[in-house]
Amino acid sequence: MDALVEDDICILNHEKAHKRDTVTPVSIYSGDESVASHFALVTAYEDIKKRLKDSEKENSLLKKRIRFLEEKLIARFDEETSSVGREQVNKAYHAYREVCIDRDNLKSKLDKMNKDNSESLKVLNEQLQSKEVELLQLRTEVETQQVMRNLNTPSSNWEVEKLSCDLKIHGLEQELELMRKECSDLKIELRKAKQTDPYQEDNLKSRDLQKLSISSDNMQHAYWELKREMSNLHLVTQVQAELLRKLKTSTAIKKACAPVGCSEDLGRDSTKLHLMNFTATYTRHPPLSPNGKALCHAASSPLPGDIKVLSEKAVLQSWTDNERSIPNDGTCFQEHSSYGRNSLSLEDNSWVFPSPPKSSETAFGETKSKTLPLPNLPPLHYLDQHNQNCLYKN
């Protein structure tokens, strides 16, 4: 717009200069016509001048308006660009601020943890130093005590220790020699066994079978002895229960109706308990018959439990003999099918505490699960009669 205004001014100036340069012609016409033309030119000039001024004003207004619009557009553009940038800047600032806050918090926590760790380390170091001091004191005390003991120990103790060590060494040497001899003997036997004929091998097998049969017999014998002892225990418990009942009833009616002799007999009977070879025997006075003779006399004696091997014939013969010696009137005992149903009356004259099982009988419990050929066993009623014979043997 400035260029346009300058062009208009230049046109006016050019017209002015052109008017100055133009040569006024010689007026051919009269004076009135020249005056009129001059007046028309002046008016036209003034009109053109006014128009130029108006156009200049309009141009200046337009320039101002254009500048205002340009400034407005620039301000809008700046505002738009600045709003987006400000938001991003604000977001970045907030994020940076949060990161700084987190960093400060973590730093404070780290400082606190470092302080706590340093304090705990100090405490632990102090405790460790105190423990080390205590250990050093204890070590010094122990060392001093050992030194004092070594200084105070007489020569006799050293000699005794030396003699004991020598005896141990001598015993170990003897055991070593015995083991060497046994090893050599076993080697010789092994060589001989390799050189033997098949007949001797059969003999060895038969011997092994005999040993197995003997061990099975031992197991059966131990089983029957255990069964007999269990039946005896059952009988003993029944007798004790009857005695306790009798004692309770007698103490209740003793002052009223029982004579003095009955209590004395009970006391005398209760004290007759003897221990003989790990077997307890209780003996009572037998009841008297009308003729004054004892029906069942003699206390029962336990069978010897140390016999390991018994033949079937001997066992059966002893049982049958004992069975024949039992009276048939049934006054002394009553036969039952198992030891769990045996019973005794208060008139029985003896009962036995069975001896505890011996170490030789432990093989039964250990080899119970093995299957071995068992010999023909006697029937069950023989065992029950044998138990009764042990209790009522004449």
UniProtKB/Swiss-Prot annotation:
Cellular localization per UniProt: Cytoplasm
PTM text: Ubiquitinated via 'Lys-48'-linked polyubiquitination by TRIM38, leading to its degradation.
GO terms under cellular component: cytoplasm
Region Homodimerization: start-end pairs: 1-197
Coiled coil: 40-76, 102-196
Region called Disordered, residue ranges: 355-379
Post-translational modification Phosphoserine, affected residues: S318, S355
Lineage: superkingdom: Eukaryota
Subunit relationships: Homodimer. Interacts with IKBKE, TBK1 and TICAM1. Interacts with TAX1BP1. Interacts with CALCOCO2.
Protein name according to UniProt: 5-azacytidine-induced protein 2
Gene: AZI2
